[in-house]
Amino acid sequence: MWERERKKFLEDIRKKSLQELEKLLDELKLELTRLRFKKQVQGLENPMEMRKVKRNIARVLTVIREKQLRGEG
């Protein structure tokens, strides 16, 4: 199931413009900050959430770089 989620996420972000990707990146970074804070204060129910968000940030950064190299945006 995670494989399907990952592929769907990649398909979705590849369709977005650079501006949309940068906005998504900001949202993901904010989510990671919230998770880090929550982890310190009360602990996380699912620690894998942080890992998932970090990997999604990396995926978005990769797609942004791909688009920059192709001259899109």
Swiss-Prot record:
Keywords per UniProt: Ribonucleoprotein, Ribosomal protein
GO annotation (BP), single: translation
Disulfides per UniProt: none
GO molecular function list: structural constituent of ribosome
Coiled coil: none
Domain of life: Bacteria
Pfam families: Ribosomal_L29
Gene3D superfamilies the record matches: 1.10.287.310
GO CC term, one of those recorded: cytosolic large ribosomal subunit
Annotated family: Belongs to the universal ribosomal protein uL29 family.
Protein name in UniProt: Large ribosomal subunit protein uL29
Organism this protein belongs to: Aquifex aeolicus (strain VF5)
